[in-house]
Amino acid sequence: MTALQNDTFLRALRRQPTEYTPLWLMRQAGRYLPEYNATRARAGSFLGLAKNPAYATEVTLQPLDRYPLDAAILFSDILTVPDAMGLGLSFAQGEGPRFARPLRTEADVQKLAVPDMASLQYVFDAVAEIRRALVQDGRQRVPLIGFSGSPWTLACYMVEGGGSDDFRTVKAMMYGRPDLMHRILDINAQAVSEYLNAQIEAGAQAVMIFDTWGGALADGMYQAFSLAYMRKVLAGLKREHDGQQIPAIVFTKGGGLWLEGLADTGADAIGLDWTVNLAQARRRTGGRVALQGNIDPTVLFAPEAAIREQVRGVLDSYAAAGGSDGHVFNLGHGISQFTPPESVAVLVDEVHRYSRQLRTSQG
């Protein structure tokens, strides 16, 4: 077990005292960085990048070499699991992901099975390689986060065959054939648990479940078709490895209505989008979980003074409900590819500067 130079992120997830508020950014390794685009060009395609452990390691470390971030996140894609199920994933230029064999019929659903994790070995090799690359002077720079899509979010792509504006195909199945939908979700939950456990075995020190499309569901349907299956995933997770606790984060975009339910999933932390008031979220969850978030990503297109002001507003909102511990700063969703890299430097600087100042004033 290599000691960490900076364990602030892990301590915040455990709601332990920290000297400042740690931060990382969703999609921190991405198209807003010129060095990422150069590596992707060498890889030839997005999947060529994501399925090559050496390239995945290179792009995972790029934002850490540019900014003093407090965690690394595995460079991969949420659709690796359904790809391993044989649905035929591809990425068309400018169109996003597509599955050649979506789940549309009862026969399609009956054939679905938890994939052999050996088919995802490239992901676990990347985790191990990133862990090695993070070691500097005998100590690991920051912790590494592993991740997966949620069972429901994966199902949206698996049934729709790609992205969707209205999710009418997957929702038609959910309302009309809930038995088929539950079968897909049950298999997905088993697969995601196994997938995250294999990432933990390979060296992930925290894991996150991205429920990107949970917010598309009606109240009641969310609890039955998304929340229940994230709870299943969490129940199947190894929460300790190599003598260390492995914190788990759940994030439902558009999930502000269901914070109490998310706090009861067994997760250590809840990710929040920018529509949620942090002080209210803290009161509603009763301090049972850490909170992660939640600045609007488009703030990064504003002038420096406005970015700094908005950062302070997020930190003040969290602190208003009782001190600054138990908070990981992040965006409310992934960083835009058009974000100026220098704006990210401003955000990182202000989070670290002002959160230290807040702790001093809190005594």
From Swiss-Prot:
PROSITE patterns: UROD_1 (PS00906), UROD_2 (PS00907). One of its GO terms (biological process) is protoporphyrinogen IX biosynthetic process from glutamate. Disulfide bonds: none annotated. It catalyses: uroporphyrinogen III + 4 H(+) = coproporphyrinogen III + 4 CO2. Keywords: Cytoplasm, Decarboxylase, Lyase, Porphyrin biosynthesis. Its EC number is 4.1.1.37. Its main location: cytoplasm. The record marks 77 as: Transition state stabilizer. Pathway: Porphyrin-containing compound metabolism; protoporphyrin-IX biosynthesis; coproporphyrinogen-III from 5-aminolevulinate: step 4/4. GO terms for cellular component: cytosol. It is found in: Cytoplasm. It comes from the Bacteria. Catalyzes the decarboxylation of four acetate groups of uroporphyrinogen-III to yield coproporphyrinogen-III. Homodimer. HAMAP family: URO_D. This is Uroporphyrinogen decarboxylase.
